[in-house]
């Protein structure tokens, strides 16, 4: 999302750095609409921009985006939604900048493994969790979702997924999902996995409202190291 905490932090830092180096920067919001973003890309190309930095609305749009910028011979940086190696090799003026999403997920699982009970708070021999996913179409969300749990199962820990819901990287949705799941599953929930910190902050609000305490009777993990999240650690 254009205005979520992570993208806002990224966008502001990017603009400050580029303008500090003397570049003229124009930023537009694709409004989570791939067709609109395609139009914006074409408009920038028509205007004769020197380079593009694009956070694709949809991972599946990578081929079309790459074809467009290659046809216009515009150097392009893709962020946040990683194309395949074959897609990246299609244009020699294309680069991708992003984190290792599988590693992020693995770190989440390892944090749970590092607790004294390895996430099995109620001692029933398994870790029961809910997963609040960002956007299932986003490769980072897919990998964080998969590898957070894989870290547990690879360590021989039995897991039980109570719920997996799409939170769209949004704090309010994270709170709503966690609130509803806490009402439905209660003390069965031992771990709340969130694909990003904004949703984790929302989940924390729901956990606190339910009278539970993180790292005591429930575990909660996110990704991004937002200041607001670090302040809660």
Language model regions located:
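A residue-level marker of the well-folded mature domains of exported/periplasmic proteins
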Residues: 1-233
């Amino acid at each position: 999302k254009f205005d979520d905490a992570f993208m806002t932090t990224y966008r502001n830092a990017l603009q400050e750095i580029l303008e500090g180096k003397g570049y003229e920067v124009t930023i537009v919001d694709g409004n989570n609409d791939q067709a609109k973003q395609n139009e914006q890309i074409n408009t920038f190309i028509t205007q004769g921009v020197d380079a593009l930095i694009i956070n694709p609305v949809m991972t599946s749009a990578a081929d079309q985006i790459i074809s467009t910028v290659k046809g216009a011979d515009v150097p392009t940086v893709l962020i946040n939604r990683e194309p395949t190696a074959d897609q990246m090799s299609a244009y020699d003026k294309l680069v991708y900048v992003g984190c290792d999403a599988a590693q992020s997920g693995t770190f989440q699982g390892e944090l749970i493994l590092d607790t004294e009970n390895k996430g099995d708070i109620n001692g029933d021999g398994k870790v029961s969790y809910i997963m609040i996913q960002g956007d299932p179409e986003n490769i980072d969300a897919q990998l964080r979702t998969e590898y957070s749990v894989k870290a547990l199962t690879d360590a021989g820990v039995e897991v039980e997924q109570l719920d997996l819901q799409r939170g769209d990287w949004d704090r309010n949705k994270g709170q709503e999902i966690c609130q509803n799941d806490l009402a439905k599953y209660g003390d069965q929930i031992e771990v709340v996995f969130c694909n990003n910190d904004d949703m984790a902050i929302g989940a924390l609000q729901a956990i606190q409202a339910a009278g539970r305490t993180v790292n005591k009777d429930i575990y909660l993990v996110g990704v991004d190291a937002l200041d607001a999240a670090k302040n809660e650690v």
